[in-house]
């Protein structure tokens, strides 16, 4: 962990840095080795290997990380902006080493199919869905990421992505046929290379959590304590009432063997390191560590 925050301190940009640490000791899936011509989603690869994966929410990752979340939640969504980031992430005109994930606009939460189709057709490796509050929204999220399934595949949730794949096969560096066999959500499809990250950010979402988790294909449940505080009238994300709800969600996820995530905001690398260790000890499997230190 010390080396992680040493890397953070070397970055001199003025924005906040977001590092995601996936500790996945509870997962027991068997490794599915990718063909040499296939892209590697390092989130999934590390999950299978029972190793942490490091990521960031910045558009221009400068460190040796496993993935980056391109944040499109705020402002006007523009697929061309995302495509430019994806091009910049390629290495020697080959599929990126850092797996690109996109957080979609909140306005697309209830009907994400069109936005998600554009993003997947561009070649992203996963989608983060903000403020999911119902089983129906979670189902729509997973369905939007799946092609219509063949008779011998899992039919639930049904795939609504459509029949085309855009430029994604070329971005991944695989054939159209290879892409279609790999472009499904993990862990519902153990060989899938797409990750669905579901954010729970309200009391309504927490109350519906058990129903939400009945939806197959969820890769990560990620908490939003600041928005949770706003939805409950608490003074802030560290309020005891918010912390109690955070622990409630964590216990549900642990019982269901689903990685649970939490964002840490720290004023120094040392504080971030301490909080990271504490949350990992509690059982969180995904941590977004934010530090304001320069």
How should each PLM-predicted stretch be described?
Residues 1-13:
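N-terminal secretory signal peptides that target proteins for export/translocation
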Residues 27-29, 224:
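Hydrophobic alpha-helical membrane-insertion segments, chiefly the h-region
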Residues 17-27:
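Bacterial N-terminal signal peptides
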Residues 2-5, 21, 32:
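Compositionally biased, low-complexity segments
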Residues 12, 25, 178-179:
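Residue-level detector of solvent-exposed, low-hydrophobicity positions
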Residues 34-294:
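Expand to "…catalyze enediolate/carbanion chemistry for C-C bond making/breaking, isomerization
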């Amino acid at each position: 962990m010390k080396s992680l925050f040493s890397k953070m301190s070397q970055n001199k940009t003025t924005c906040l840095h977001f590092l995601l640490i996936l500790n996945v000791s509870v997962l027991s899936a068997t490794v599915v080795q990718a063909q040499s011509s296939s892209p590697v989603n390092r989130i999934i690869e590390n999950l299978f290997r029972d190793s942490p994966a490091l990521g960031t929410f910045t558009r221009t990752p400068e460190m040796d990380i496993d993935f980056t979340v391109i944040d499109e939640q705020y402002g006007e969504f523009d697929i061309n902006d995302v495509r430019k980031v994806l091009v910049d992430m390629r290495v020697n005109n080959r599929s990126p080493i850092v797996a690109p994930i996109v957080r979609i606009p909140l306005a697309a939460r209830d009907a994400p199919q069109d936005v998600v189709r554009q993003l997947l057709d561009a070649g992203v490796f996963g989608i983060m869905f903000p403020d999911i509050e119902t089983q129906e929204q979670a189902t729509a999220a997973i369905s939007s990421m799946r092609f219509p399934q063949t008779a011998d595949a899992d039919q639930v949730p049904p795939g609504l992505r459509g029949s085309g794949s855009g430029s994604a096969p070329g971005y991944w560096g695989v054939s159209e046929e290879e892409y279609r066999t790999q472009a499904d959500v993990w862990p519902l499809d153990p060989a899938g290379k797409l990750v669905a990250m579901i954010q729970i950010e309200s009391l309504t979402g927490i109350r519906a959590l058990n129903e939400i988790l009945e939806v197959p294909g969820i890769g990560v449940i990620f908490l939003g304590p600041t928005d949770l505080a706003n939805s409950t009238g608490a003074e802030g994300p560290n309020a005891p009432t918010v912390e109690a709800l955070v622990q409630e969600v964590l216990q549900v996820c642990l019982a269901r063997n689903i990685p649970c995530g939490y964002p840490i905001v720290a004023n120094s690398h040392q504080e971030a390191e301490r909080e990271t260790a504490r949350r990992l000890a509690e059982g969180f499997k995904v941590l977004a560590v934010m530090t304001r230190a320069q």
